[in-house]
Amino acid sequence: YLVASNHQSWVDILVLQRVFNRRIPMLKFFTKKELIYVPVIGFAWWALDFPFMQRKGGASARADLEAGRKACEKFRLVPTSVMSFVEGTRFTPAKHAQQKSPYRHLLKPKVGSIGMALEALGDAFTGFLDVTIVYPDGTPTFTDALAGRLGNVVVRVHLRSIPAEVLPPPGEPAPRAAVQAHHAFSQSGGVLG
């Protein structure tokens, strides 16, 4: 599966792993390179072959694209669900205001990782899981989760097909895939609104 979700907290990762555990192939995230240095978790993500991205633009963007493609080639060999937090970062009111996002509870989407995954693996995906996570009692911190103070969590999952016209020919970029992902994300904005 190709999985996309909104992103508010580190807790989102725990929630997604819990919701999808043993229901779909293991989730693998496109992860910020800095997170490799987080004790235990960074090593685990490295050992599990999560792709680490620098996300700085320029030459780094080309290196990220190549790293992402290599990761997707490995994903083709082992059942994997490719996960993308489409906003590219955790939502905060300050980031929302700075971006002037057209969505009430979401940042503007960054769909490069989805386009890359569709370019490399499009024909292998069973479907697109459009996930919305809502914390009605307020967004918890990772410490809240560890202390058992998670509160209510609402997870909405919509299984969407990936239209054939969105998939690029092998080796070609996936601009239509990015547009499709943006459309799905816009619908999620309505759910959160």
Over which residues does each language-model region extend?
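Alpha-helical structural motif
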Residues: D12, V40, S113, P175-A178
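Catalytic core of membrane glycerolipid acyltransferases/transacylases, capturing the structured
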Residues: Y1-S60
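Conserved beta-strand elements of the Class I
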Residues: L2, M83, L129, H183-S186
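A cross-family acyltransferase "interaction/gating" segment
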Residues: K33-L48, R76-P169
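Well-ordered alpha-helical segments embedded in enzymatic catalytic cores
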Residues: V15, A67, S113-M116
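A Trp-anchored, charged/polar loop motif used as the substrate-binding/catalytic surface
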Residues: R62-E73
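Accessory terminal regions of nucleic-acid processing enzymes
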Residues: P168-G193
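Hydrophobic, Leu/Ile/Phe/Ala-enriched alpha-helical segments that form helix-helix packing faces
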Residues: F20, A71-F75, L118-L121, H182-G189
